[in-house]
Amino acid sequence: KKIETFANDQGHLSPWVTWPTIHRGINNEKHTIGFFGQNLEEIDNEFPPLWNILRASNIDVGMFGSLHSYPLPKELNNFKFYVPDTFANGPECFPKNISYFQDFNLKMVDVSNRNVQSKLPIKEALKFSMNFYKLGISNKTIFDITSQIFKEKAIKERVVRRRSLQAQISFDIFYKNLLTFKPTYSTFFTNHVASAQHRYWLAKYPNDYKNILYDDSWIEKYNHEIDYAMQTADKF
């Protein structure tokens, strides 16, 4: 059976474009969002995202990580919690204490950029770790953080699994706030599965390609990364 994907967006397919289309119900010719760091004030006023529409309709909302959700809205009434995406220009969150996580999170994104690096922003990591329990980080996640550090030392390519760990940490915080505030509408967004698919599809499905620019050792190292990312999401 042939499956066809249809989208009204013009130009190349990009999550930075497609998600605003979904959130706002109009295509990119109208919302004109195509990259991070755009000033969205006028766009948000004319074509507000779903979470702002619900808030304005007196429906309480919990929003975590949706793309193009920075900065914090000027009006926070009816938002139970609000955590902008991992590409935000600043760490501001609501409630304010989540900013300890977001500050660390954004620094990690800056350090790793396209390829995950083994560096750690020490100052932000310490502040974040001192607030683990207040933020809702589970004992299992704390164990997994510790385990990840040791695994990276033994097998250096395991550093790429930090993306999945970041999503796991994020979900702990989301879930804590979900249980605490019980919003009528809530969303949680993670990009770690898509990121693994973009980078390691060839390692998982080498037979899909006629010309392979990577050697067998690279494929062997990374052929389980998509599965690992998806299994992490399944455990949320």
Segment roles from a protein language model:
Residues 1, 228-236:
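Metal-dependent active-site segment of extracytoplasmic phospho-/sulfohydrolases and closely related
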Residues 1-18, 60-64:
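Short, structured active-site-proximal loop/turn typified by the sulfatase FGly-forming signature C/S-X-P-X-R
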Residues 13-18, 45, 49, 169, ...:
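Generic alpha-helix structural propensity
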Residues 25-219:
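His/Asp/Glu-rich, glycine-adjacent segments
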Residues 42-45, 227-231:
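A short beta-strand-to-alpha-helix junction
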Residues 219-229:
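Membrane-interface transmembrane-helix boundary segments in multi-pass integral membrane proteins
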